[in-house]
Amino acid sequence: MVRYMRYIATFGYHTNHIFDKNGKIIGIDDEKISNMILIYSLDVDADENTVNSIKNTKNYIESKLKEYNIPYLFVEVNPYEFNTNVKNFRKYIVPKTIINLTGGKRIVGYALFYAAVLEKENVEKVFYVSKLGDIIEFPLIPPDIKLTELEMKILNLLDKEGEMSVSNIAHKLERSLSTISEYVSQLEKKGLVKKLSKGRRKIVKKVI
């Protein structure tokens, strides 16, 4: 299997959001990961226990990634330099990147999420891992998003009907299949819908 995805994760005092109880990487098959970037932060007044805890977490991550033969980079940031962090995080988001926002300081996760929104064309998914191990995926919707009248009609129809095929949407809205296909693709680029394959049919569903 070809390794082709970058995995970016924030972390703090533990790794149970990155590795499951069997030591497998959460959110993706480890054989698909080309490299990993692990982001953490330390306050300038961090005490010895905090520093040692972060060090132990780094050591464990390092040992697991060496075991899987996955190249990695640790990045320490100042958590409160938000704009600088966003700018730098954007550089790490290459095509086919997945992002795990669960660990570490919340403000660092916010900066990484904001960077992901700005680089959404390169992002496969952004997610959070709950205490029970459930993966919660975040939609990447820019705050200044604008919708056309037909896009709104498509979204309203999906609200009422749930999942629908592209041809069914076209029939309901009395528009050509090519027109609806074009507008559904625009909504997908904006992060508002997903297209799923069910046999030969393309099914459309809202992200949120």
UniProtKB/Swiss-Prot annotation:
Q: Which Pfam families match?
A: HTH_24 (PF13412)
Range of residues in the leader sequence: none
Task: Specify the domain of life of the species encoding this protein.
Answer: Archaea
What does the UniProt keyword field contain? Antiviral defense, DNA-binding
Q: Name one GO molecular function term.
A: DNA binding
Q: Which InterPro entries match?
A: Csa3 (IPR010163), WH-like_DNA-bd_sf (IPR036388), WH_DNA-bd_sf (IPR036390)
Tell me the Gene Ontology biological-process terms attached to this UniProt entry: defense response to virus
Q: What protein family does this chain belong to?
A: Belongs to the CRISPR-associated Csa3 family.
NCBIfam families in the record, alphabetically? cas_HTH
Q: What protein name does the entry list?
A: CRISPR locus-related putative DNA-binding protein Csa3
Q: Which organism is it from?
A: Methanocaldococcus jannaschii (strain ATCC 43067 / DSM 2661 / JAL-1 / JCM 10045 / NBRC 100440)
Supply the gene name: csa3
